[in-house]
């Protein structure tokens, strides 16, 4: 069984962003190589202009604050410049950055007014703008970014077609999506989003009913707009006939099965995650490790947040099967101790069979509030009017869930 959910709004970038080409479709997974080639560098004539600003490679009023901008990128023989919204920067002509080593460039800006919000972009050879939204800096601080200048889209593949678990004693495929900045910039490390039912995420030929969650499209769109941080996505296929057992924490006698959820989560934490972290440049802490699923996948995701060692710090439960085993999840939540995720996203539709479990989902959101979660801060609860328990409904709400769990790109 599956459920559905809604995303209401997304954050817009408020200040002008240098336009670049929109994302193109990702193909099969390429090698983990970084850095641009000369053929890939083009001037972006659509850059933001500021007729009132002039180039000043020095500093301004010494009474202001100092902000350090640091860029990590393997530029080779190229040079990095920076343009921005406030003096001593401007949008017309770049100020050269100082090369600290082969992968690090920096510039110190002195004299910025306290509280001033600087928008800025690295520019390669003062000709090729970085992709994606403007970066922001405010106050006396050091801001470090890992940009990209060439790639518009990430790539995905069924990276491990025969991943074998010794804990579960079975084999399944694992899909991997790598975002564009990761593929271009060898200094970039990324948060990781683990998702259940991997068959339904990427490939229409493998998806239930031929309808996917449009994961590559959503990730590539966000990489361009900055709606949420770029991330590696790990799509873990379900094990077919073992799906119900693996996605449930207890046996439900009314269904006649279930109860291997703890073992399934151990597989994710003890077998799959170490392989992912050793294969890719990941940010492996709980705040950068997201777990998302729908229906029974939403049930096991919510359960994962309060069990184990707190590996998954951000939980997405879409149309979760709260009804399982007389709503055992709600009982477990009320008994949960110190292990709790930092962020929780819960949603459903309100139409179709059982109204997509909207009543149970509302009770789940209430249970999180009773634990101290605050709506809009550490909890987001969404009901999508008219939505049913379908892949297309989950696909439509996925960007909103990721926006909350990953946070916007800076």
Predicted feature residues:
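Ser/Thr-rich, Pro/Gly/Ala-heavy low-complexity intrinsically disordered linkers and tails
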Residues: 10-64
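A short, amphipathic beta-strand motif
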Residues: 65-73
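Non-catalytic cap/lid and distal C-terminal segments of serine-dependent acyl enzymes
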Residues: 76-87, 100-107, 150-410
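Sec-dependent bacterial lipoprotein signal peptides
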Residues: 1-11
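Aromatic-rich carbohydrate-binding modules that target alpha-glucans
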Residues: 73-117, 124-142
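Short Gly/Pro-enriched loop/turn and capping motifs at secondary-structure junctions
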Residues: 5-6, 127-128, 351-353
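N-terminal carbohydrate-binding/catalytic regions of secreted carbohydrate-active enzymes
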Residues: 115-116, 121-123, 176-177, 186
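Extracellular beta-sheet/turn segments enriched in Thr/Pro/Gly and aliphatic residues
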Residues: 21, 57, 138-154
């Amino acid at each position: 069984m599956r459920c559905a959910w809604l995303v209401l709004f997304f954050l817009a970038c408020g200040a002008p962003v240098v336009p670049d080409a929109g994302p193109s479709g990702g193909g099969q997974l390429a090698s983990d190589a970084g850095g641009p080639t000369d053929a890939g560098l083009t001037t972006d004539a659509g850059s933001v202009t500021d007729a009132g600003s002039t180039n000043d490679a020095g500093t301004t009023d010494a009474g202001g604050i100092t902000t350090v901008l640091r860029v990590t990128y393997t530029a080779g023989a190229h040079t990095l410049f920076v343009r921005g919204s406030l003096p001593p920067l401007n949008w017309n002509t770049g100020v050269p950055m100082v090369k600290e080593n082969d992968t690090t460039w920096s510039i110190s800006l002195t004299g910025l007014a306290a509280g001033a919000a600087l928008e800025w972009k690295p520019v390669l050879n003062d000709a090729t703008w970085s992709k994606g939204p403007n970066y922001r800096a405010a106050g006396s601080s050091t801001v470090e970014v890992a940009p990209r200048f060439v790639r518009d889209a990430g790539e995905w593949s069924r990276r491990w077609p025969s991943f074998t678990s010794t804990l579960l004693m079975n084999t399944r495929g694992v899909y991997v999506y790598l975002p564009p900045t990761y593929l271009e910039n060898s200094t970039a490390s990324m948060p990781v989003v683990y998702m259940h039912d991997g068959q339904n995420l990427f490939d229409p030929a493998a998806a239930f009913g031929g309808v996917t969650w449009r994961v590559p499209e959503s990730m590539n769109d966000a990489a361009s707009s900055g709606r949420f941080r770029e991330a590696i996505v790990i799509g873990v296929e379900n094990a077919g006939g073992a799906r119900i057992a693996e996605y449930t924490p207890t046996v439900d006698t009314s269904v006649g099965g279930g109860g291997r959820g703890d073992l399934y989560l151990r597989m994710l934490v003890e077998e799959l995650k170490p392989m992912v972290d050793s294969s890719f440049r990941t940010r492996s802490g709980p705040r950068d490790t997201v777990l998302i699923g729908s229906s029974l996948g939403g049930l096991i995701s919510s359960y994962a947040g309060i069990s184990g060692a707190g590996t998954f710090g951000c939980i997405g439960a879409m149309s979760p099967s709260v009804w399982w085993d007389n709503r055992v999840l709600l009982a477990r939540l009320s008994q949960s101790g110190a292990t709790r995720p930092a962020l929780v996203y819960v949603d459903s539709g309100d139409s179709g069979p059982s109204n997509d479990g909207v009543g149970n989902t509302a009770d789940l959101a209430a249970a999180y509030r009773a634990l101290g979660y605050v709506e809009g801060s550490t909890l987001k609860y969404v009901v999508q009017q008219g939505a049913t328990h379908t892949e297309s409904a989950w696909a439509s709400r996925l960007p909103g869930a990721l926006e909350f769990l990953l946070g916007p790109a800076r």
